[in-house]
UniProtKB/Swiss-Prot annotation:
GO molecular function: glutaminase activity
Enzyme class: hydrolase
PANTHER family recorded: GLUTAMINASE (PTHR12544:SF29)
Subunit structure, interactors included: Homotetramer.
Species annotation: Methylorubrum populi (strain ATCC BAA-705 / NCIMB 13946 / BJ001) (Methylobacterium populi)
Catalytic activity: L-glutamine + H2O = L-glutamate + NH4(+)
Pfam families, A to Z: Glutaminase (PF04960)
Name this polypeptide is given: Glutaminase
SUPFAM superfamilies recorded: beta-lactamase/transpeptidase-like
Family: Belongs to the glutaminase family.
Biological processes, Gene Ontology terms: glutamate biosynthetic process; glutamine catabolic process
Length: 309
C-alpha cells in the first residue's frame, strides 16, 4: 500500500490536534465513560497489509456497526424473505424514531435503524434460544475478524437494557403487527448484547474485508456471501448506514459505511480495502464527528470514492 501508512498516520495526528470533537453519547450511561480524546484508524487490504494510526488497538463498543453483520447472517438464513419484514429505504429520521413505524404498518424503513435491526435480530432468534442466537452472532464476528478473543461487554449490555425504553416501545409496536414473532424480551436481549460487542479498529476492519472483496474474505480463504449479496449490502450501507446523516456521508466520503454511537465507523472501499475509524464524539445525527472528517480526508488523499477521483 504505497504511501498509505504515511497517509493514515498523518490523518491520525491531524485528528488528535482538532478541538472540535463532537459529544460522547450519554443516553447509554456506559458509553458516556468513553475518552473523547481517543482516535483510531485502520485500513486493511486483501493481502492483509495494515496501515494503522492512533488508538487502533483499543476496544470500543461497536453498537450499530453490528447491524451489518446481523443483516448478513439473517439474509443467509432466510434470503430475500427478510424484505417482507424490513425495507431498504433511507429513513430521514433519527435512528430510534417511532414515527415511520406508525405510518408504515410496523415495517421498519431499513435494517440499520433501531427498529429494523431489532426485526433482523428477531429473524436470527427464530428457532433458537436467545443464548444460542447470540452465540451464533458472536462466533460469526470472531470468524470474520479472525480473532476468538472478541467478546460482549456485559456492562454496556446491562446499561442499554436499563435505559432502552424507546427500543422496547419500537419492539412492542412491531410485535402488534407480527413483524416481531418471538417474545419481545428475548429479541431485545439479543439485540442489546450484539450491540455491546467490543472490538478494536483492527478487528472491525478485518471483519469487513468480505464486503470489500465481493463476498470473499481473503484472510479466511473462502467466500462468506455471494458477490451479488455483498454488492447489495454495500448499497444499503451507502444509502442508510448513517441514519439521517447518510446522504451527507455519501456526499462527503463516497464509500459504503456503517456508524455506531460508540464512535466507530466501518467503511468499505470495494476492491481496495476495509476501513475502520473510531472517535467517540458524535455529531447531531449520532455519527462520529471526527470519524467522518477522517474518512473524507482519506478518500481525498487516496482517490477511493466509489464516485471517482
Amino acid at each position: 500500500m504505497p504511501d498509505l501508512d504515511r497517509i493514515v498516520k498523518d490523518i491520525a495526528e491531524e485528528m488528535r490536534a482538532r478541538p472540535d470533537r463532537g459529544a460522547v453519547a450519554s443516553y447509554i450511561p456506559e458509553l458516556a465513560r468513553a475518552d473523547p480524546q481517543a482516535f483510531g484508524l485502520v485500513v486493511i487490504d486483501g493481502d492483509g497489509r495494515v496501515a494503522a494510526g492512533g488508538d487502533a488497538d483499543i476496544a470500543f463498543s461497536i453498537q450499530s456497526i453490528s447491524k451489518v453483520f446481523t443483516l448478513t447472517l439473517a439474509l443467509g438464513m432466510v434470503g430475500d424473505r427478510l424484505w417482507r419484514r424490513v425495507g431498504r429505504e433511507p429513513s430521514g429520521s433519527p435512528f430510534n424514531s417511532i414515527v415511520q413505524l406508525e405510518r408504515e404498518n410496523g415495517i421498519p424503513r431499513n435494517p440499520f435503524i433501531n427498529a429494523g435491526a431489532i426485526a433482523v435480530t428477531d429473524v436470527i432468534l427464530s428457532g433458537h434460544q436467545p443464548r444460542e442466537a447470540l452465540g451464533e452472532i458472536l462466533r460469526f464476528m470472531q470468524f470474520l475478524a479472525q480473532d476468538d478473543s472478541i467478546a460482549i461487554d456485559d456492562r454496556v449490555a446491562a446499561s442499554e437494557k436499563r435505559t432502552g425504553f424507546r427500543n422496547a416501545a419500537l419492539a412492542n409496536y412491531m410485535r402488534s403487527f407480527d413483524v416481531i414473532e418471538n417474545p419481545v424480551d428475548y429479541t431485545l436481549g439479543v439485540y442489546f448484547h450484539h450491540c455491546a460487542i467490543a472490538m478494536t479498529c483492527r478487528q472491525l476492519a478485518t471483519a469487513g474485508l468480505f464486503l470489500a472483496y465481493s463476498g470473499h474474505h481473503p484472510l479466511a480463504g473462502h467466500s462468506v456471501i455471494s458477490a451479488e449479496r455483498a454488492r447489495r449490502i454495500n448499497a444499503i450501507m451507502l444509502t442508510c448506514g448513517h441514519y439521517d446523516g447518510s446522504g451527507d456521508f455519501a456526499y462527503r466520503v463516497g464509500l459504503p459505511g456503517k456508524s455506531g454511537v460508540g464512535g466507530g465507523i466501518l467503511a468499505v472501499a470495494p476492491g481496495r480495502a476495509s476501513i475502520c475509524v473510531w472517535s467517540p464524539g458524535l455529531d447531531a445525527a449520532g455519527n462520529s464527528h471526527l470519524g467522518r472528517i477522517a474518512l473524507e480526508m482519506l478518500v481525498k488523499r487516496t482517490g477511493w470514492s466509489i464516485f471517482g477521483v
